[in-house]
Amino acid sequence: MENFEVIKALFLGFVEGLTEFLPISSTGHLILFGHIIDFHSDGGRVFEVVIQLGAILAVCWLYRQKIINLIKGFFSGDVESRHFAISVLIAFSPAVIIGVLAVDFIKSVLFSPIVVAIALIVGALIIFWVESKQFEHKTDDATKITFKQALLVGLAQCVAMIPGTSRSGATIVGGMFAGLSRKAATEFSFFLAMPTMLGAATFDLIKNADVLTSDNMVNIGVGFVAAFIAALLVVKALVLFVERHTLRVFAWYRIVLGVIILIAAMFFNLSA
């Protein structure tokens, strides 16, 4: 049975890695598939946090050279590097403030399958709306984002604290609304994910460190590696995809997933 739980952890790790950076809500997928395969981890919330950490580290690895260049440029006084670093900080700040104030409310009240399903469907409608508008894309390079655009993306990210919204979905759509091209919005979403998810993961790991035991470390480790590998496959593919296609296919997928979760919650006792 323990080996079977490891296989389940491997599967959910891949699910996390495949869905974290797509605008389709990794939370919704983990709730649904975790219920379907009846996965139980003594690590609970820590398992989810660590596999999310695996996904974000994949982005750090893929963009490592750009990150290194930005850091070097920042400390050497390069204006563009400093501008971009400040832009990420501006976008990151609203999530820090709202997250600290609302974390208990979000986890105790909003974290339910019904909320996730509704957020998936509403998010899909917003994607359809944004894609139907002809916004003037003033910025085609993520590193050229303005401070105003960064703030708008940061505020959009706060909406993603509602489970099922999708952090990547909110920030990509928010970026497009602010005047970024689809590709620039996607790449800025990746960079914003780094401090946001690393910060959230660190906070949750410290808060739940007592549940990390030798009994659940294998499941957590397997899930981490699976999420890392899956995210490596998705990130570059997503950038190539959004250069040529709209986000409408993800919107349709969100509606289907939202309806499935609603049905499962009402008739099959699906729980978060």
Swiss-Prot record:
CC per GO annotation: plasma membrane
Domain of life: Bacteria
The reaction(s) this protein catalyses: di-trans,octa-cis-undecaprenyl diphosphate + H2O = di-trans,octa-cis-undecaprenyl phosphate + phosphate + H(+)
UniProt subcellular location: Cell inner membrane
Transmembrane segments: 4-24, 43-63, 86-106, 109-129, 145-165, 186-206, 222-242, 249-269
GO BP annotations listed: cell wall organization; peptidoglycan biosynthetic process; regulation of cell shape; response to antibiotic
Listed EC numbers: 3.6.1.27
Keyword Lipid biosynthesis tagged: no
Broad enzyme group: hydrolase
Keywords for the protein's UniProt record, in alphabetical order: Antibiotic resistance, Cell inner membrane, Cell membrane, Cell shape, Cell wall biogenesis/degradation, Hydrolase, Membrane, Peptidoglycan synthesis, Transmembrane, Transmembrane helix
Name of one Pfam family that matches: BacA
This protein's record includes keyword Cell membrane: yes
Signal peptide extent: none
Membrane topology according to the record: Multi-pass membrane protein
GO MF entry, a single one: undecaprenyl-diphosphatase activity
HAMAP family: Undec_diphosphatase
Function: Catalyzes the dephosphorylation of undecaprenyl diphosphate (UPP). Confers resistance to bacitracin.
Similarity-based family: Belongs to the UppP family.
Misc. comment: Bacitracin is thought to be involved in the inhibition of peptidoglycan synthesis by sequestering undecaprenyl diphosphate, thereby reducing the pool of lipid carrier available.
Stored PANTHER family: UNDECAPRENYL-DIPHOSPHATASE (PTHR30622:SF3)
Name of the protein this chain belongs to: Undecaprenyl-diphosphatase
Designated gene of the protein: uppP
